[in-house]
């Protein structure tokens, strides 16, 4: 906030954008340097031997997590106290744990500690830590970069206990960044990926908010914008419903443990991955476009989880329509893409009557509480409104007020 005040004092009288590069002293004093952590995800192509080593590491990390969780639960039940156990304590009893990367086991312990902290600090959103199953089809482990133990050279990446693994480096890491941790994962379809977390300095330059946008959540189209075309989300899950249902029926008819069942399981997994990738790509591109164009974006702080649940008496339920478009993920992506540029995402209180207020005169029309009312005329000024467009404009103006 202090930075914004300083910027306003430096503005010309006509309130145009100020060029900080016109005055190097002002430019130097007003910029902000922040440390940013950013993850890059790449496809990797391990050899058969490396796949086996990955599988062993996945299993050991899962074993340590489950073993430590089980011992903690038992110890707490007997004594009422917390057990501070570590992976090193189990290596004597289970010597095969020494064959894998020790940092993978240490990170499994950190994940368990984080699960407990989340549970104790926010029980409303986090449940008790649960045992990990090998039957989910998803496996992963994380390791840290220590003195160059993880590094990239050409089209290969070096990993502890694994060696050099072929990687599809479709985009370079951020220049002058440092590799902190990597996470190796295997999808249900059998593909291997690596997520590389890097740390770098990001220079954020103060801006005067000039371009404002309001987004109203749309059940079928992701959002309706105050000053843009609607998102028109393609509903990838709905489009793939028939194909996915057919593949799942075939899977249910395959004999347990047979090779044909495993092949069909992979086909189903590939369909799910395709839908997830399509959704991810769409959300990232939309968020990038909006973050580049606008300085402040306002949204309603709604609970998608609550909207997806059927209300008592079956009054309404948005179900799959809500969860398919990935609104929460879109908001998270949009928020950090704005923050990288020194911009702001403003979350409006969910009880703010954005759909009931006439954005022209401010009259409150209570009949729009009924969701079936999609268009209405203001009794005071006579303006004709589209429900969602009017709400988006009101959200924009409220975001403008809150960011002032």
Question: Which residues are covered by each model-predicted region?
Answer:
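Positively charged, helix-rich recognition surfaces that bind polyanionic ligands
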Residues: 175, 188-404
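Acidic carboxylate diad motif detector
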Residues: 85-188, 320, 324
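Catalytic micro-motifs at enzyme active sites that drive phosphoryl/nucleotidyl and oxygen chemistry
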Residues: 30-32, 171, 181-184, 199-205
